[in-house]
A protein has these predicted regions:
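Carboxylate-rich, polar loop motifs that coordinate divalent cations or form catalytic acidic clusters
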Residues: 1-290
Length: 290
């Protein structure tokens, strides 16, 4: 490992080192969403540049320093969507000091300003998971559609507090919420809640789903506050496999998943990083060596 601490030498160091999201652009730069704004890291010279309200490089009150989500669409690789706790900001990565646009709940474009995850559905539509519902935003017409939870509607979200989004190869959008998993078929405009139970007669588990990761196989991986779940998304009545300490997971609160270029699955937890050993069907702690 190489450690990078203290991004900037001022009073906000601790907040800046709490990284919420990372995104790489086509020029090799890393963009970091932190508790103290947006940073760009240049790996060629190990330099950081901060973009936040106090530095006036993003001179509008739409942009809040807490950045939860970063997203660069494949079809527009020079656009960076920045999801903060007070709305959405669109940047051109070639000129990030000049925001191209903003979107806030007050403008009628968001279900809530606190954005947790951003995802492209197609070339013109963005999905924005927020702390109070899901927004489908048309980037051409600037029109928005909202999806909420409703106790009287079994085809609605299980909870309005959303955490993560993932789109699979069949264009099904999987949604991680504070009350479990849902999937959205935008062609049918239908949401299905997914029962997370291994027993058809058993009580459904209302787990907090922090992150989602899909193929190469048919498994949908979920990180939760009760370990890691592997769910077979191809089987309608499928249960799940749970990975906790007995399966090598370092901490029951599992946060983030990523698959590297070699196909290895990496897991971030509240107590370190693990990787998945497929041959043994268990996670192994990645030890830090100085």
């Amino acid at each position: 490992y190489i450690n990078y601490f203290v991004l900037v030498p001022d009073a906000f160091d601790r907040m800046a080192n709490e990284i919420r999201s990372i995104c790489a652009d086509r020029h090799g730069m890393l963009w970091l969403g932190t508790f103290d704004g947006l940073y760009r890291f240049n790996p060629t010279d190990n330099s950081f540049v901060r973009y936040e309200t106090r530095s006036r490089k993003l001179p509008n009150d739409t942009y809040n320093n807490l950045v939860n989500a970063l997203y660069i669409p494949e079809n527009t690789p020079d656009l960076l969507y920045v999801g903060s706790s007070s709305g959405l900001v669109v940047l051109d990565i070639r000129h990030p000091e000049q925001p191209l646009g903003t979107l806030r709940a007050e403008d009628g474009g968001l279900t809530d300003n606190d954005i947790k995850s951003i995802l492209s559905y197609d070339d013109t539509h963005l999905l924005l998971a927020t702390a109070d519902g899901l927004t489908l935003y048309d980037t051409r017409s600037c029109q928005a559609s909202a999806y909420y939870s409703s106790l009287s509607d079994p085809t609605s979200l299980p909870n309005n507090s959303l955490r993560t989004l993932f789109r699979d190869r069949q264009n099904i959008v999987w949604i991680g919420t504070d009350s479990g998993l849902a999937k959205l078929d935008l062609k049918r405009k239908k949401i299905d809640c997914v029962r997370l139970t291994n027993d058809r007669k058993g009580a459904e588990r209302k787990v907090i789903v922090n992150d989602l990761l899909g193929p190469p196989d048919h498994s949908l991986w979920l990180t939760t506050n009760e370990g890691v779940l592997r769910y077979d998304s191809t089987r309608r009545d499928a249960g799940y496999t749970r990975y906790m300490a007995d399966k090598g997971v370092s901490h029951s609160i599992a946060k983030r998943l990523i698959r590297d270029s070699h196909g290895t699955l990496w897991l971030g937890t509240n107590d370190g990083i693990d990787y998945y050993d497929a041959a043994r069907d268990r996670f192994v702690r990645a030890e830090h060596s100085n």
